[in-house]
Amino acid sequence: MNSIKYYLIIIFVFSIQFNINNVSAQWTQAGDLNDIGLYPFISVVDSNIVWIAGGEISAVVYRTINGGLNWISIPTNGLPFELSGIAAKDASAAFVCDYAGTKTGGNAKVFKTTNAGMNWILIDSTGGTNGYFNGIKFSKTQPQFGVTFSDPPSGKGNPYFLLKTTDGGNNWSRSSAPGIPNTFGLFYTLFVIDPMMYGFQIINPTTTQTKSYITKDGGANWINGNQNITYAEGVDLVFSDNKQTGLITNYNTNHEIFRTTNGGVNWNSGSTGLNLSGFNGACWISGTNTVFIYSNASTSGNNIIRSDDGGFNWTAQSTSNTPGLMEMDYARFNNTIVTYCVSSKGNIIKSRQSVQNTGILQSGNNVPGDFKLYQNYPNPFNPNTKIRFSIASEKNNGKQNVKLIVYDLLGKELVKLADNKLSAGSYEVEFNGGNLPSGIYYYRLSAEDYVEVKSMILIK
């Protein structure tokens, strides 16, 4: 047995291969759907499995399992009205919410399927005579936690209706957010960081001003942001995983965005410097400083821009001249994202791009006396786990070159979790094995003359 272990270590040390993903910022066509309505919603499970929901008068649901080469119409028996949100878990399971079938709403519903639409099971309904659901989402970092929210069932100014799950959607519990006078919620604005922080945008239809509405303690208290954005339908709200930095997009043509650095208490006006008109949605990539803004303008052009510094600087991306973009979602596989976007005309575009992990968090202020690589936790894991390491005092009072790399059993490099100059301290980084099969993997820390290797087990 010892000789076998020694042989595996020899393979690992001397058979390291470098794997470079060829990613592109070019968006390409991934399908066309004719009957999904003006307000479609999209949920990306992985690079191949994507669900889309919408409809004009009745519910419409589609799914692809081959990256958009083919889209299959999912049965909607039991879904009475057009849909206002979708969150998919895999190729068979998904959750949807509805508009309640009238302009004023009332008794809106949430459903789930576990057999690709052969049956839809009612989870809950709002009751009341007003409002409808405005979206349903699960956390990217803690996918067992999800939220859906509805306008106040008793009318504007009354409490908002929420449902929450902490077990992946098996069970849902009712919650609420205090009513704000003469307001209701906005489509496409729901964001979910984790069980503590989530929120959405609200609008006053009389003044057409919108504000953020955010909780940081799991719904016990809600923050009503100080921004007043004139015009409104569709102003989007996104946050970084740090829970402090967030962006709000606007419905205008003057490049305006709003930014917070204190978790939504205060918002300041800024600009992208690039011309996007119409409703501008946003998508913040979890664990990074990368943010996308996309436009539903009816004119063709490059309707997506990208920032890699949390919204300070922006570059335009080629989008195959696809107008009317309504919602974007993605699946992240460490330093690569596969992103899909759906338009109001039923066009779907997708892109595979690289991102930089900003999840290297310094934990504690003490300077370690030794280099150390800790066992990942949890272990076994599925699909996320955290890896801690310590860097001893710097040489010559400078930072050290630190690399933390994950390999497979044959020594093939899978992803660089860290490749940075770091000061002495204790650090933590998160690894996502969502695109990998079950098995044993190695992670290797190197800093100056120090090298340490540990193994971890992914079980799906």
Whereabouts are the PLM-identified features?
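Repeated scaffold domains used in trafficking and secretory/extracellular systems
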Residues: 37-42, 81-87, 131-138, 183-191, ...
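Asp-box/BNR beta-propeller loop motif
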Residues: 26-31, 60-75, 109-124, 163-176, ...
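C-terminal outer-membrane/trafficking sorting elements
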Residues: 364-377, 381-460
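An edge-strand/N-cap motif at the start of beta-rich repeat modules
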Residues: 23-44
